[in-house]
Amino acid sequence: MTVSADFTPLLHKAALGRPLDSHEAETAFHAIMAGEVDPVQLAAFLTALKLRGETFAELTGAVQAVRHHMTVLPDVPAGAIDVCGTGGDGLKTLNVSTAVAFVLAGLGVPVAKHGNRALSSASGATDVLEVLGIPPTDDLELQGRRLREDGLVFLAAPQHHPAMRHAAPVRKALGFRTLFNLLGPLCNPAQVRHQLIGVFDGRWCEPVARALGALGSLSVWVVHGSTEEGGSDELTLAGPSQVSAWQDETLFSFRIEPDMAGLAAAPISAIRGGDAQTNAAALLALLDGAGGAYRDTVLLNAAAALHVAGRGDIVKAGVIDVPAFRRNVGMAADSIDRGLARAALEAARMSAHSIAPKDAGRS
């Protein structure tokens, strides 16, 4: 291993409890992504940041470094959106953002969904998509074709962030959330400028929205839901959700209640998930018209995503426009009830098998 000479003084600074500026954080994470940091040093660095509390500048610098090392998907349609969460909330729910992606695609919104295998849930996006017959691929040409022709592509994190492997063993050994848990949603390989992102801790809503705005995003919602079992990285029916939004170069925050969308409250246990097969079956049932809390949770998040994508403005001067919000819920419901979302899934499945992915068997 070639050890970075630039990293050690930054480790010392972090160990003293002093914050790094964005340039220093970018330098540190460049070294990490290049595999030039000793595992013991990396563990000490991440722990020091965690204990002191990571800052906005450190987040921004880390994002710039990770984006520099990622494999970018070129020629992405204007207006493409990502809907994803950080994971790490420990609630083990059904796959909400994956279902939202099909709902949006059914309405003609181009979706470049960034995802991974299960972290805190029983089944991550990649796990359930494989069961649905939509395996990941590292073929950029095929990914681009899926997005251009189907309006939907799923981008598995390992295929686009190979440099993350240098940090993976240390992150696993540490066993607690670090700054890395936030970086995936902020580093979409399609470089989308519209995003609905869920975070595991509400304190990150505003910094993440502000960071994405500073890095060129046009429209962003960063959300954190409340439940009877703790916070959620999605908008929930179980309680109020915190939102920080970046739009028109302005940052503002507000709360959303389920009844604003015309939806009934429900406990988080109503959307408890299982393994990949269980979650895939629930998603198919949802797209085939099944009702209940899972459908309503998907509608709530899809309505927000439609706003972020510019398909139905539901915020006026930083305040939720309730009738407009409910119209967006209606649009999302229409995608399901008219079979548009299910058709989007079938198109994605057909595209996945029109050319056999090079890495379909990779775990």
Curated annotation (Swiss-Prot):
Chain positions recorded as anthranilate 2 binding sites: R171
GO biological process per UniProt: L-tryptophan biosynthetic process
Binding locations of anthranilate 1: G85, N116
Molecular function GO terms recorded: anthranilate phosphoribosyltransferase activity; magnesium ion binding
Enzyme class (EC, first level): transferase
Keywords: Amino-acid biosynthesis, Aromatic amino acid biosynthesis, Glycosyltransferase, Magnesium, Metal-binding, Transferase, Tryptophan biosynthesis
Cofactor(s) listed: Mg(2+)
Residues binding Mg(2+) 1: S97, E234
SUPFAM superfamilies: Nucleoside phosphorylase/phosphoribosyltransferase catalytic domain (SSF52418), Nucleoside phosphorylase/phosphoribosyltransferase N-terminal domain (SSF47648)
Top-rank taxon, per record: Bacteria
Gene Ontology cellular component annotations, sorted alphabetically: cytosol
Pathway: Amino-acid biosynthesis; L-tryptophan biosynthesis; L-tryptophan from chorismate: step 2/5
Annotated Mg(2+) 2 binding sites: D233, E234
Binding locations of 5-phospho-alpha-D-ribose 1-diphosphate: 85, 88-89, 93, 95-98, 113-121, 125
EC nos: 2.4.2.18
Cofactor note: Binds 2 magnesium ions per monomer.
Catalytic activity: N-(5-phospho-beta-D-ribosyl)anthranilate + diphosphate = 5-phospho-alpha-D-ribose 1-diphosphate + anthranilate
UniProt similarity note: Belongs to the anthranilate phosphoribosyltransferase family.
Function: Catalyzes the transfer of the phosphoribosyl group of 5-phosphorylribose-1-pyrophosphate (PRPP) to anthranilate to yield N-(5'-phosphoribosyl)-anthranilate (PRA).
Assembly and oligomerization: Homodimer.
Protein name: Anthranilate phosphoribosyltransferase
Source species of the chain: Gluconobacter oxydans (strain 621H) (Gluconobacter suboxydans)
Classification lineage: Bacteria, Pseudomonadati, Pseudomonadota, Alphaproteobacteria, Acetobacterales
Encoding gene (name): trpD
